[in-house]
Amino acid sequence: MQESHFFAHLARMKLIQRWPLMRSISSENISEHSLQVAFVAHALAVIKNKKFGGTLNPERIALLAMYHDTSEVLTGDLPTPIKYFNPEIAKEYKKIEAAAERRLLDMLPEELRDDFRPFLISNTADPDESAIVKQADAICAYLKCLEELSAGNHEYAQAKKRLDVTLRERHSEEMAYFLQTFAPSFELTLDEIS
């Protein structure tokens, strides 16, 4: 049996900091972020199914969300303003991400690859499931902005404005429900939510 470094690489997710160009009151790594995205994606899928006639698999979507940023253990977290500075950079970075995803998949023993492929290779996921994960990813970035702004960190004001646009572009009924029901609490203190 051949040794695999796959999970040793995933364990390094905790070392990759998000928001690297921003002064943050509370730091966040991609391991923490992926767990929060999994929570939110799962909730969005449940909300869509219960309230808006969806037929999604919330557990599968939570797994997709857990793995959605794993390629960053090889690429690092490129800040959004750089990643999307122009279409050429965005296109080339997508190629880098795809190569990193394939490299991670290739680290697994051959007999496990088919089971992990849908979670590691982003272009193999079902478009409806991917859309929920993308929505959750944007919501989590938005919630981070709310937390930082409510703690007095105005460094996140511009990021929040950019995310307001992103959330409008990705709008869905389940997102609106989630944001109306859960987001306001992120601007409150511990005493206020207790």
UniProtKB/Swiss-Prot annotation:
Main location: cytoplasm
Binding site for a divalent metal cation: 33, 68-69, 137
List of residues binding substrate: 18-19, 33, 69, 77-80, 137
Alphabetized Pfam families for the sequence: YfbR-like
Site feature location: Appears to be important in orienting the phosphate for catalysis: 18
Matching PROSITE patterns: HD (PS51831)
EC numbers on record: 3.1.3.89
GO cellular component: cytoplasm
Reaction(s) the record says it catalyses: a 2'-deoxyribonucleoside 5'-phosphate + H2O = a 2'-deoxyribonucleoside + phosphate
MF term (GO), any: metal ion binding
Cofactor: a divalent metal cation
InterPro entries attached to this UniProt entry: HD/PDEase_dom, HD_domain, YfbR, YfbR/HDDC2
Disulphide-bridged cysteine pairs: none
Sorted UniProt keywords: Cytoplasm, Hydrolase, Metal-binding, Nucleotide-binding
Record keyword DNA-binding present: no
Subcellular location: Cytoplasm
Keyword Cytoplasm in record: yes
Positions of the HD domain: 30-142
Chain segments annotated as coiled-coil in the UniProt record: none
Sequence similarity: Belongs to the 5DNU family.
Assembly notes: Homodimer.
Protein role: Catalyzes the strictly specific dephosphorylation of 2'-deoxyribonucleoside 5'-monophosphates.
HAMAP family from the UniProt entry: 5DNU
Protein name: 5'-deoxynucleotidase VC_1978
